[in-house]
């Protein structure tokens, strides 16, 4: 599982959307979605990682209490309509984002190595680490609720129904070091959502 960022109060926020009793009935496994969360990159060069953390406000929450029609439409699109079970509050509140991420492209402002010139894609040497609810829901709610993945970005990983329960969406892991490990690099991460929205953030990356 990827290194988790700071928990941002998601559990307490989604706790407020349901009954205060010990359990409640739900047709949907995903309890809510966050619309276009604000992105922040945090570098952990000693682990060759950059973590994509996020934050949001109450207007970005889509659930059975906020924007009900959209929540139902998203649930239907994701085929998350037949969970039909009692849920216990202490089991947690699965949360994802809306819309899904279509692609992630990583570039560097300098020459990373002999195969990667300035501003060229680094996707062939970077793995994205994330967790998703998609298999659990598509299988009819069988198996592991949330599965973790580590996939080369150039292989176009499926980022649907990504886990957003904690404070981070995903981490990118460099599989090789830059030619000059003492240099400082500005790494840009461009996220494209399936609705065409693009968000890019840049973070300094220096191993030594």
Language model region names:
Residues 1-9:
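Bacterial N-terminal signal peptides that target proteins for export
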Residues 12-13:
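Intrinsically disordered, low-complexity segments
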Residues 16-19:
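C-terminal motif of bacterial Sec signal peptides marking the signal peptidase cleavage site
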Residues 21-208:
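Non-catalytic macromolecular-recognition regions in eukaryotic signaling proteins
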């Amino acid at each position: 599982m990827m290194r988790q960022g700071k928990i941002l109060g998601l559990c307490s926020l989604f706790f407020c959307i349901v009954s205060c009793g010990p359990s409640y009935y739900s047709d949907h496994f995903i309890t809510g979605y966050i619309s276009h969360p604000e992105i922040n990159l945090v570098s952990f060069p000693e682990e060759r990682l950059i973590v994509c953390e996020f934050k949001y406000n109450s207007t970005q929450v889509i659930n059975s209490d906020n924007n009900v029609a959209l929540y139902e439409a998203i649930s239907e699109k994701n085929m998350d309509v037949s969970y039909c079970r009692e849920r216990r509050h202490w089991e947690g509140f699965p949360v994802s984002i809306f819309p899904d991420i279509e692609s992630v492209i990583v570039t560097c402002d300098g020459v990373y190595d002999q195969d990667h010139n300035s501003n060229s894609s680094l996707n062939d040497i970077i793995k994205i680490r994330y967790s998703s609810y998609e298999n659990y829901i598509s299988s009819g709610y069988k198996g592991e609720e949330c599965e973790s993945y580590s996939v080369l970005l150039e292989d176009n990983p499926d980022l649907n129904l990504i886990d957003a329960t904690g404070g981070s969406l995903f981490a990118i892991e460099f599989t090789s070091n830059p030619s000059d490990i003492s240099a400082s690099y500005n790494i840009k991460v461009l996220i494209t959502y399936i609705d065409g929205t693009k968000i890019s953030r840049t973070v300094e990356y220096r191993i030594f």
